[in-house]
Amino acid sequence: MRIGISCHSTAGGSGILATELGIALAKRGHTIHFVTTEPLFRLRGFYANIFCHTVNLVPYPLFRHLPFTLALSTKMFEVAKEHDIELWHVHYAIPYAACAVIAREMMPKDQRFHIVTTLHGTDITLVGRDPSFEPVITFSIERSNGVTAVSESLKRDTYEHFPVKREIRVIPNFVCVDQYPQAPDP
């Protein structure tokens, strides 16, 4: 399968989780295309079926702030079209799921990819509590083909604070214990 993944590229939990998931999927034979703002903190080494695309943020005098969401949506669209992406996995409803929805809508109808959104705490418990973000978070969740949350409490909070009807599946964060062997007990 040809899979796009978008996440924060920094050392935070969602970026680590998304990168490790991409590596695991690549090891199973899938082709992974990461779209991020900078090289992934966690991606070390070379994988023949992992590709990284960076979002080009061009300063534009009219805008006070760089139009990140527009640039991200465009890059997702370009990668999806050029590489025939079948599934896009995004970490965070905003901005990533919202941008994936825009990118998918730009695609010809017969080439539209599925979107899986993984919700993390900031989506729901911090940024999501601001009423100005509720409509776009709800829209992005509802327009996703699948939605996961990293904990039962996050799933409950999502249903409590957003008028979401889509099923949310809990997939807890994981750590590959083989990468971190325990020292023997003294």
How would you label these PLM feature ranges?
Residues 71, 108-116, 122-142, 156, ...:
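Nucleotide-sugar donor phosphate/pyrophosphate-binding loop at the beta->alpha transition
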Residues 5-11, 23-68:
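N-terminal strand-loop element at the rim of the active site
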Residues 8, 119-122, 172-173:
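Histidine-centered beta-alpha loop that forms part of the nucleotide-sugar donor binding/catalytic region
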Residues 1-3:
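Extreme N-terminal starter segment of soluble prokaryotic enzymes
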Residues 13-21, 132:
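Conserved alpha-helical elements of sugar-nucleotide-dependent glycosyltransferases
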Residues 142-152:
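A short beta-strand/loop micro-motif in the catalytic core of glycosyltransferases
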Residues 72, 85-112:
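An aromatic- and histidine-rich active-site surface loop
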Residues 153, 174:
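Carbohydrate-associated surface elements
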